[in-house]
């Protein structure tokens, strides 16, 4: 898609800048919130490009806002430090009450701002696994571990989608098995034909499978398959980082993961160590095709090839 390519080009140009920013931390005061209308009453909020060293394509995670007479439903909450900016952007869309906020996964760039909205009366909704992860220290994204307001109060597990109706929209919270983390959810707006997929798909850098928080390669592949089945030919998919894609964009992404997995498995079968597998450059056929794929191993701005290969090796070596 043209929009996605333009955004990724900008992100690539900012990768060098991200190396410097990585050492300095995130300059939250420089982050501005951009609002984009996705459907008549559905909006996407995103942070400034080339400010967040971990996400040069846009600071923090993407936020969804469903607005209307029934109140506001939000998807994710960004960093705690920019909660006031996010709130101002939401209120500019609609001054009504923020009734619900659902989290796609537990990382701080998606959940650290939860307390800002919970204290205004929003009911926090998420997977039980996500709540359990957030309750364990350390807190993420600047959130205070001692502040219970940041934790979801309405939780669900793996199973059928949680479905509700609001503002003329049918919203589905679709749980997926351990993928990016152990408590991922994709959120579908049926009438708008939009799905917010969280971080098990990203269009900058290689996949990030957070095994420390329950993520798995097998689950990430399954989540991609589920998304391709649920999405229609015209469905707009909003990743946690990056611009819109559609289901056909997921195919080369999935195929790349499968190819790397199979090559790493082959080398493990030959008795290769992780360092030997890294030296084999198994991602070489994809490095120039994956935006950010040529970033060196010590660079911020997305998951590098070496980081991804280490994740794959670790999971396959463990026989998972």
Where do the protein language model's features map onto the residues?
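Metallo-beta-lactamase
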Residues: 71-73, 77-81, 163, 170, ...
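Bacterial N-terminal signal peptides
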Residues: 10-20
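Conserved beta-strand hairpin/beta-sheet module of binuclear metal-dependent hydrolase folds
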Residues: 37-90, 185-189, 193-197
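Active-site HxH/HxHxD metal-binding segment of metal-dependent hydrolases
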Residues: 88-165, 182
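Accessory terminal helices/loops
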Residues: 21-25, 29, 229, 243-320
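Acidic/histidine-rich helix-loop elements
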Residues: 46-61, 134-144, 204-217
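Short N-terminal segments immediately surrounding and downstream of signal-peptide cleavage
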Residues: 25-40
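Divalent metal-coordination and catalytic microenvironments
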Residues: 41, 66, 76, 90, ...
């Amino acid at each position: 898609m043209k929009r996605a390519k333009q955004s990724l080009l900008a992100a690539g140009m900012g990768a060098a800048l991200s190396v410097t920013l990585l050492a300095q931390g995130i300059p939250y005061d420089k982050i501005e919130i951009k609002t984009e209308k996705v459907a008549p009453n559905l909006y996407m909020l995103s942070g400034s490009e080339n400010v967040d060293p971990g996400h040069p394509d846009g600071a923090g995670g993407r936020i969804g806002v469903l607005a209307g007479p029934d109140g506001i439903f939000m998807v994710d909450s960004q960093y705690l430090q920019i909660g006031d900016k996010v709130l101002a952007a939401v209120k500019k869309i609609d001054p009504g009450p923020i009734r619900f906020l659902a989290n796609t996964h537990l990382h701080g760039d998606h959940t650290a701002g939860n307390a800002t909205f919970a204290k205004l009366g929003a009911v926090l909704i998420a997977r039980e696994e996500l709540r359990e992860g957030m309750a364990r220290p350390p807190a993420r994204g600047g959130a205070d571990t001692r502040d219970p307001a940041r934790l979801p109060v309405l939780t669900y597990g793996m199973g059928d989608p949680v479905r509700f109706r609001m503002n003329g929209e049918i919203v589905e919270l679709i749980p997926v098995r351990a993928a990016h983390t152990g408590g991922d959810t994709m959120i579908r707006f049926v009438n708008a034909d939009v799905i917010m997929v969280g971080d098990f798909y990203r269009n900058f850098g290689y996949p990030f499978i957070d095994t420390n928080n329950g993520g798995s390669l097998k689950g990430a592949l399954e989540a991609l398959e589920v998304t391709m089945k649920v999405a229609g030919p015209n469905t707009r998919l909003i990743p946690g980082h990056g611009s819109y894609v559609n289901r056909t964009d997921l195919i080369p992404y999935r195929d790349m993961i499968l190819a790397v997995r199979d090559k790493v498995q082959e080398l493990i079968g030959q008795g290769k160590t992780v360092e030997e597998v890294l030296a084999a450059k198994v991602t070489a056929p994809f490095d120039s095709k994956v935006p950010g794929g040529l970033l060196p191993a010590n660079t911020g701005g997305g998951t590098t090839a070496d980081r991804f290969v280490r994740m794959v090796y670790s999971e396959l070596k463990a026989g998972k």
